[in-house]
Amino acid sequence: MELGTERIRKLLVQYAVPAIIAMTASSLYNMVDSIFIGHGVGALAISGLALTFPLMNLAAAFGSLVGVGAATLVSMRLGQRDYETAQRILGNVVVLNLIIGISFGLLTLVFLDPILYFFGASDATIGYAREYMSVILWGNVVTHMYLGLNAVLRAAGHPRKAMYATILTVTINAILDPLFIFGFGWGIRGAAIATVLAQILALVWQFRIFSDRNELLHFRRGIYRLKGKIVRNVLAIGMSPFLMN
């Protein structure tokens, strides 16, 4: 896609339609989990799942902090034909998501029970919430990486591929949920494992795209060292969507 020469109206459609489809598919994520958990585990498990939503939103907010900021900077640098800086932004996204994803996951795991009780957990629901969220938090770095790379993928001129990554996670999650909950009898933990595995598979697909040296932005040596200016700009731009989440 020629971002610098294509007609604005055509670009708007090519970006807006995949984004709308991806957002619609993404909204089905928690709905699918809720349906299978409700039928396979019970009403208390649904209550436990609901307790995890604030933490899930916070994790997504940190993903937006890096993803939106990086995507904006990548778009600007590509428009300026500053491909070297755009490459370094990609590398910094990987490192930032590793740091934030691991830190958030481990820190929240340490204080998980007090946090869940703060959100209204009872003795009847804390077990379900803990069982689900502990798996999600161990895979939190995958979530951050997946969200960050998807934002950069879209900014690099591949809105359809970013949409496909989202649809892939939702579809795999919907397939694995009944298998793990009903087939293997893993209960609410099975739903969490399905979510993490779906994101891992999407992340593998993203890595394959960014490993292609024919891509304008691709993984290579020398781009993973954090640059203060890049990090500050990413966080400054991403702060607004972070706070909105």
Model regions: which residues?
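Short alpha-helical transmembrane segments in multi-pass integral membrane proteins
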Residues: 1-16, 74-141, 185-238
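Transmembrane helix-bundle signature of multi-pass secondary active exporters and lipid flippases
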Residues: 20-72, 136-143, 232-245
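Helix-loop interface residues and adjacent transmembrane-helix termini in multi-pass membrane transporters
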Residues: 28-31, 40-43, 77-80, 155-156, ...
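Interfacial helix-capping/hinge residues at the ends of transmembrane alpha-helices
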Residues: 34, 71-72, 112-113, 147-150, ...
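Small-residue-rich hydrophobic transmembrane alpha-helices
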Residues: 46-106, 143-162
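Hydrophobic transmembrane alpha-helices of multi-pass small-molecule transporters
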Residues: 58-61, 173-178, 203-207
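Structural signal for membrane-spanning alpha-helices in multi-pass inner-membrane proteins
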Residues: 108, 151, 177, 181, ...
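Short runs within selected transmembrane alpha-helices of multi-pass transporters and secretion channels
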Residues: 136-154, 162-173, 191-204
